[in-house]
């Protein structure tokens, strides 16, 4: 008796999984208050990773390098010693 052993192979590659197709959420970094804007104490002025902009007068720096206003006043972006700083100056009553 003659026995025939037939095997059929795929003529196209299987559609396997891919390592692409995902992305991280945007972190919403950048300026949150503009130059000349009136802000209250505790307001976030600039969200950043590292010290892209340095804290100036009446501005604090959080643990994630976020810059925030320590007092109520007007925001001023300025250059000091070749570096960008953001300061908050109190409003002068007239």
Swiss-Prot record:
Domain of life: Bacteria
GO biological process: translation
Keyword Protein biosynthesis: no
Entry keyword annotation includes Hydrolase: no
One GO term describing the cellular component: cytosolic large ribosomal subunit
Region called Disordered, residue ranges: 12-33
Keywords assigned: Ribonucleoprotein, Ribosomal protein
Family per similarity comment: Belongs to the bacterial ribosomal protein bL27 family.
Protein's UniProt name: Large ribosomal subunit protein bL27
Upper classification of the organism: Bacteria, Bacillati, Bacillota, Bacilli, Lactobacillales
Gene name linked to the record: rpmA
């Amino acid at each position: 008796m003659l026995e025939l052993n037939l095997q059929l192979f795929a003529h196209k590659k299987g559609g396997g999984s891919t390592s692409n197709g995902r992305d991280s959420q945007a972190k919403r970094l950048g300026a949150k208050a503009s130059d000349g804007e009136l802000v209250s104490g505790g307001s976030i002025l600039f969200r950043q990773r590292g010290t892209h902009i340095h804290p100036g007068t009446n501005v604090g720096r959080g643990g994630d390098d976020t810059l925030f206003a320590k007092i109520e006043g007007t925001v001023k972006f300025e250059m000091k010693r070749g570096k960008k700083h953001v300061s908050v100056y109190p409003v002068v009553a007239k």
